[in-house]
């Protein structure tokens, strides 16, 4: 889907993601469930 440097997340976007690091689902933030 969407990957690289944050994906859907990006600073608390879609589902309260931390942004940066991971891509679409999981990972170091971004996508679903980030660092806060």
UniProtKB/Swiss-Prot annotation:
Coiled-coil ranges per UniProt: none
Record region (Disordered): 1-36
Keywords: Antimicrobial, Fungicide
GO biological process: defense response to fungus; killing of cells of another organism
Domain of life of the source: Eukaryota
Summary of the function given for this chain in its UniProt record: Possesses antifungal activity against a number of phytopathogenic fungi, including H.sativum and F.culmorum.
Protein name, UniProt field: Glycine-rich protein GWK
Lineage: Eukaryota, Viridiplantae, Streptophyta, Embryophyta, Tracheophyta
